[in-house]
Amino acid sequence: MISSHQKTLTDKELALISGGKTHYPTNAWKSLWKGFWESLRYTDGF
């Protein structure tokens, strides 16, 4: 079951992944997201 908050976060993540508009265009957020995405890649073996 997905809450509205989780869906909103997912939409933002999709926007970041696709390189589209983002609600958090700050360098800090991009750095955090990059680190998070890298950790996902290593964990899931992408």
Curated annotation (Swiss-Prot):
Keywords: Antibiotic, Antimicrobial, Bacteriocin, Plasmid, Secreted. It is found in: Secreted. It comes from the Bacteria. One of its GO terms (biological process) is killing of cells of another organism. Residues 1-20 form a propeptide. Coiled coil: none annotated. Has a bactericidal effect on sensitive cells but not a bacteriolytic effect. This is Bacteriocin acidocin 8912. The gene is acdT.
